């Protein structure tokens, strides 16, 4: 098994991850389950690395994945320059406990 399936169809899983990544860049922190946060972290770090290039091709590549254009603008104008000197490790995961309904491990995923 090369990746997490989350019990979802391919389209649903991709849409969920795109929504979580968009929310992470828009709000700079999200609360979600542990496995979802690990997948979102991987995608988000790659997008920040692409955004650090700052050219038109990089912007178009990010627009393919992130739903909202204003979030891409924020990624390129404020988030990417913030990490210009950092070589990876743009996010952190903080455990916040367990969800009451199903005891799923909840974490806070935030930009450093």
UniProtKB/Swiss-Prot annotation:
Keywords: Ribonucleoprotein, Ribosomal protein. Belongs to the bacterial ribosomal protein bL17 family. This is Large ribosomal subunit protein bL17. Part of the 50S ribosomal subunit. Contacts protein L32. It comes from Desulforamulus reducens (strain ATCC BAA-1160 / DSM 100696 / MI-1). Gene3D superfamilies: Ribosomal protein L17 (3.90.1030.10). InterPro entries: Ribosomal_bL17, Ribosomal_bL17_CS, Ribosomal_bL17_sf. GO terms for molecular function: structural constituent of ribosome. GO terms for biological process: translation. HAMAP family: Ribosomal_bL17 (MF_01368). GO terms for cellular component: cytosolic large ribosomal subunit. Coiled coil: none annotated. Pfam families: Ribosomal_L17. The lineage of its organism: Bacteria, Bacillati, Bacillota, Clostridia, Eubacteriales.
């Amino acid at each position: 098994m090369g990746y997490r399936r989350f019990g979802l169809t391919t389209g649903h899983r991709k849409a969920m991850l795109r929504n979580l990544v968009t929310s992470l860049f828009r709000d700079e922190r999200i609360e979600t389950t542990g496995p979802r946060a690990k997948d979102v972290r991987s995608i988000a770090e790659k997008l920040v690395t692409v955004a650090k290039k700052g050219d038109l091709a990089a912007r178009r590549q990010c627009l393919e994945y992130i739903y909202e254009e204003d979030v891409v603008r924020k990624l390129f104008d404020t988030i990417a320059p913030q990490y210009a000197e950092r070589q990876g490790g743009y996010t952190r995961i903080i455990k916040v406990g367990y969800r009451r309904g199903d005891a799923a491990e909840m974490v806070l995923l935030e930009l450093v």
